[in-house]
C-alpha cells in the first residue's frame, strides 16, 4: 500500500443529517462546503489541478463570498504553483490565505498572494522564501536554455513577491539569494502576511 493510499484511509468521515436522511462526507469535502480549501504537502501538477478546480467550483457557487485556503506546504514545482497563483488572481471572490505549520518556497508565494488584509499565519508557523531551484544535464546548448529559463522564472517570482509584500525588487532579490526562514511575526513585518492569529477572528468565522 503506497503512502497516498494510506493517507486516504486515515481521512475521517463525517455524517450530516439532511432532509433526505444521513449523508457521509470525507472531512475535506465537508469543509469545502464551508469554502475552506487545504493546500497541504508538495505542490505538483496533480495538486494544482485539484486546487484550481476547487477555486473555480466555489466561484461558480457564489462569486461574492470569500474563499479560505489553509497552507501547510514545503513548496514544489514552480509552474504548478503559478497555475494556482493565476487562478487565485483570476477569480472574483477574495481569497484569504492562512499558514498552518509551514509555507515554504511556492507555498510562501501563494500565502503572500492572498487578498490584501486577509493573509494570516498561526503563531508557530514558519515561512521560507528562496530563489527557484534547478539542476540540469545534457548538451551545453540545452543547459544554457534551461539556465536562461530559470533566471526568467526567478525574475518573475521576485516581481510577484515584491508586488504582494511591498518590498523593493532589490530587497527581494537579495533576501531570496539563499533559504530565508521567517517566524510568523517576522513574516508579518516583511509583508508576507497581514496578521498573526492566536485565535480565529470573528470575521473569519462569518466568512466561512
Swiss-Prot record:
SUPFAM superfamilies xrefs: ClpP/crotonase (SSF52096)
Subcellular location as annotated: Cytoplasm
Subunit structure: Fourteen ClpP subunits assemble into 2 heptameric rings which stack back to back to give a disk-like structure with a central cavity, resembling the structure of eukaryotic proteasomes.
Keywords assigned by UniProt, alphabetized: Cytoplasm, Hydrolase, Protease, Serine protease
Parts of the chain that traverse the membrane: none
Similarity comment: Belongs to the peptidase S14 family.
EC code(s) of this entry: 3.4.21.92
A Pfam short name: CLP_protease
Protein name (record): ATP-dependent Clp protease proteolytic subunit
Active-site residue numbers: 105 (nucleophile), 130
Enzyme class: hydrolase
InterPro entries given in the database record: ClpP, ClpP/crotonase-like_dom_sf, ClpP/TepA, ClpP_His_AS, ClpP_Ser_AS
GO-annotated cellular components: cytoplasm; endopeptidase Clp complex
Amino acid at each position: 500500500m503506497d503512502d497516498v493510499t494510506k493517507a486516504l484511509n486515515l481521512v475521517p468521515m463525517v455524517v450530516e443529517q439532511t432532509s433526505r436522511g444521513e449523508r457521509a462526507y470525507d472531512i475535506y469535502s465537508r469543509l469545502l462546503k464551508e469554502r475552506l480549501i487545504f493546500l497541504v504537502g508538495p505542490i505538483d501538477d496533480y495538486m494544482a489541478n485539484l486546487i484550481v478546480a476547487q477555486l473555480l467550483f466555489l466561484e461558480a457557487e457564489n462569486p461574492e463570498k470569500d474563499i479560505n485556503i489553509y497552507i501547510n506546504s514545503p513548496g514544489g514545482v514552480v509552474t504548478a504553483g503559478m497555475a494556482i497563483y493565476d487562478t487565485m488572481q483570476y477569480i472574483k471572490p477574495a481569497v484569504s490565505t492562512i499558514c498552518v505549520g509551514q509555507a515554504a518556497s511556492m507555498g510562501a508565494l501563494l500565502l503572500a498572494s492572498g487578498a490584501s488584509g486577509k493573509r494570516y499565519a498561526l503563531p508557530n508557523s514558519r515561512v521560507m522564501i528562496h530563489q527557484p531551484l534547478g539542476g540540469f544535464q545534457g548538451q551545453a546548448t540545452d543547459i544554457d536554455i534551461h539556465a536562461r529559463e530559470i533566471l526568467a522564472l526567478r525574475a518573475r517570482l521576485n516581481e510577484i513577491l515584491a508586488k504582494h509584500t511591498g518590498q523593493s525588487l532589490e530587497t527581494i532579490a537579495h533576501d531570496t539569494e539563499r533559504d530565508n526562514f521567517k517566524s510568523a511575526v517576522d513574516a508579518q513585518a516583511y509583508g508576507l502576511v497581514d496578521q498573526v492569529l492566536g485565535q480565529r477572528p470573528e470575521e473569519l468565522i462569518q466568512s466561512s
